[in-house]
């Protein structure tokens, strides 16, 4: 059975990863000519929008063969606004290639990606690209990597005539030079190796290469390659490195079925394509696959497999490989197929922190816009959106302005809907202060429904989200009614007392009664929001604001300015640390206050400063800070208005 490696290529914008992908395919023989980003004819940027803009938006999957190893490769977006695409890709990888431009060096996005790969222990090769460009400096970038990312890096090549088209490379192991980087890193990682070296036993090249391969596959060290993908320099060395320094995927077809959905697309005929990375077992055409959290199974109608630059139809896929499955209409990105295991990584890099209103310029197309967003959200679950029940405005959560531009172009190109955005705001949340309880009895007071519901609300731990518990047995309240209550609780929690989503909350169903001839799930669905909001009102809520974890690096002469800015933005941070000729400051900062700070730093440090942020979570805002939001549904706290709306809807 052929060995398989599933790898991803990640990088900051314009580091050249799509060009690297094209050259890997070309030098491995998978394609006959190299596509170019500027000509819009690359293999992986298949969306028309990607070709027009020259950037990767959706992760693409393609394969090639090298040294009798099948390599499935995912080319991911580089812009931070498409971090959700990168996030999903990482769940499927055996290894990652992190591309850094030899001209621009380490960027904020580079640090975010590397820290995530390190945290998830994904074996990583670093490739320093664009060494043919004027201004490129490999030695400087390598020292930046050691200083700012990891000292467990090993340079495997020497490069000459950098910054010109005459640039060329020599493998260190093709010369008589014993690599000091390798000796130092291996001495740190391998006690037996260190003892022999101190004892005067000089390691040979074969031993060093064997040890480097072992520890790279564990994710303990990072091989560094270099080149210029635009002219094909360094690509064959990188191909060898993929097979030498990444672990092979498990091919245990006899184990229990285990896989993860990492991507969803639709064909021109609107047929759903489910991309699956299989970690164990096998899937064949006509197999029935259990849908997570649902009591249904769906039949696999067709399977496509990646094969040497193309896609071929197959009867089955086996452990270690990537397959494209047809017929699984209910599966979503992130769903586990079969059983979960420790290889299915729990990834959370970022969450959208901005919310905006979106509408069709031709208002009559707003219903079509809602349908189009529904289809796009199927491919990107972090594209959360909702419609205001009162004025029918549509709200969408986003990472930033570039994603907003791309979403606008996609809606125009794919669905013929021109849109406009307004009222961009930061997403806050709220959480209960204390305990609150409420009960509404059927057909009493303001409850016209055949349903009795009692709820208790209290704080949960930070980061727990919404925890729902039923203390009512299915014997006394049927499952269909209990499901309706839980669904209504989840839906109503999207807007609390301040209008923001209620989180870190424990909701307990304390009471539930029905009247056999008359009660329906709709009765419970309609009465629950009033009970929930009344209990929440008694508990009261506090505002939670989103925070970014940050690291700020600035020249020493900019320290006082940086500290003043951070204090003004309500950041909390540790004492500055001197690193060489720079100061490094780490801490937490409100998202609302730091949105434009990267541009400001670039200005006052003349491009020498670096501000790296990563979504941290939500924290209770200070008591004097308030940020209410207009309700987008009829407020169940105003029972008369809410009931009037519900009863009119029932009559209609």
Swiss-Prot record:
Gene3D superfamilies per record: 3.30.230.10, 3.30.70.240, Elongation Factor G (Translational Gtpase), domain 3 (3.30.70.870), P-loop containing nucleotide triphosphate hydrolases (3.40.50.300), Translation factors (2.40.30.10)
GO biological process: response to antibiotic; ribosome disassembly; translation
Binding of GTP, residues: 11-18, 75-79, 129-132
Domain of life: Bacteria
Keyword flag 4Fe-4S: no
SMART domains referenced in this protein's UniProt entry, alphabetically: EFG_C, EFG_IV
Keywords on record: Antibiotic resistance, GTP-binding, Nucleotide-binding, Protein biosynthesis
UniProt GO molecular function: GTP binding; GTPase activity
Domain tr-type G: start-end pairs: 2-252
Keyword Transit peptide part of the UniProt annotation: no
Function summary: Abolishes the inhibitory effect of tetracyclin on protein synthesis by a non-covalent modification of the ribosomes.
Family indicated by similarity: Belongs to the TRAFAC class translation factor GTPase superfamily. Classic translation factor GTPase family. TetM/TetO subfamily.
Designated name of the protein: Tetracycline resistance protein TetP
Organism: Clostridium perfringens
